[in-house]
Amino acid sequence: MITLGEYIIKKQHESPEATGELSSILGAIRLATKVVNRDINKAGLVDIIGATGVENVQGEVQQKMDLYANDVFKAALEARGEVCGVASEEEDEFVSFNDQRCINSKYVVLMDPLDGSSNIDVNVSVGTIFSIYRRISEPGKPAILEDFLQPGTEQVAAGYVIYGSSTMLVYTTGYGTHGFTCDPSLGTFYLSHENMKIPDNGSIYSINEGNYLKFPQGVKKYLKYCQEIDGPTNRPYTSRYIGSLVSDFHRNLLKGGIYIYPSTASAPKGKLRLLYECNPMAFIMEQAGGRATDGFNRRIMELTPTELHQRVPFFCGSSKMVDKVEAMMEEYSSEEK
C-alpha cells in the first residue's frame, strides 16, 4: 500500500526539475484535510454547524464550518512557508502571507475550503477544492492580485477532498488523476484509485431541475433528450443531484455522467466560481479524459479571469455528453434572442 506522502515523493523523484516545494504544499493541504475531516465528524456534537449570520462577498450567508475550514487551511499553508498568498471563496480579497519565507516562495493557492457546507447539518457529503499556481510576481515581495488572476491552463496542481462515507483526496499535477482514501484508524491516505478515467459516455446527469424554467433553451432540450426512452443509447438517463459540487462531480467521475450549472435568468453569468471551483475541477476532469466547458465550446481552463469571485456557466463530465449538450446549446441559441 502506498501512502499519499510516499506517492508525492515518488512523483517528485520522477521530475528532475522538482525542488520539493509543491510536495510540501500538498502535505500542508493533506494535514488541513485531516483536521477538517475530524471536526466534520463531530459536527453534531460541538457548536460548529449552522449559519454565522454574516454574508460573504457573493451575498451568501456563511456557515460556521466554512470559516473554521478556511482558517485551518490558511494556517496550515502559512506554516509551511511555501505559499506567498491564498485566495478563498470565504475571503473578500486575497490574503498575502508576509513572513519572509512565504514572501520568497513561488506559489499561490486558491480554494473553496468547504464546498456544500449548507448540507452539513443534514449529514450530506461535503468537500474541499483547491488549486495551485506559480506566482507571476517577483519572489521576495508580497503577492499581488495578478498572481491569482491566471487562466486554469497555468495550474500546476489541483484537487478536491470528499468527506463522505469514506474520506477521499483526488488530485492531479498534469500527469493523470489519482485518488487516495483515508484509513480512519490511522489517519493516513492510501492510494486507492490510480490514473482515474471517466467513461466517454455515461447515464447520469446532475443539474438542479428546480430551476428548469430559468434554463437556456439548449439545456431544456438536452434534459428532454436525457429523459426520452431509447434503448440503443441507454436512455432515459438517471438524474442525480446532491447540491454539493464535489459529491456530484466525484460520482460522475467514477461512473460516467455530466454535471451542469448553466447560466439562468436570475444568474446570467452562472453561479459557480471560475477560480475556486471550475478551474480545479476542469483540470482534474481533463486529466481523467473528460471535458469541462462553459456550454459554448469554450474550454473552462482557457477563460481569462478578470476578478477573484468571477462566476461562469459550467458543463463538466463525460466527453460525449458534453459534446451533445453543447451541440444543443448551439442549435437552440437563436431561440434565446
Curated annotation (Swiss-Prot):
Q: In what pathway does it function? A: Carbohydrate biosynthesis; gluconeogenesis
- Name the domain of life this protein comes from: Bacteria
Q: Name one Pfam family in it.
A: FBPase
Chief localization class? Answer: cytoplasm
Sorted alphabetically, the keyword list is: Carbohydrate metabolism, Cytoplasm, Hydrolase, Magnesium, Metal-binding
* Entry similarity comment: Belongs to the FBPase class 1 family.
Task: Output this protein's name.
Answer: Fructose-1,6-bisphosphatase class 1
The species this protein belongs to is: Psychromonas ingrahamii (strain DSM 17664 / CCUG 51855 / 37)
Q: What is the lineage of its organism?
A: Bacteria, Pseudomonadati, Pseudomonadota, Gammaproteobacteria, Alteromonadales
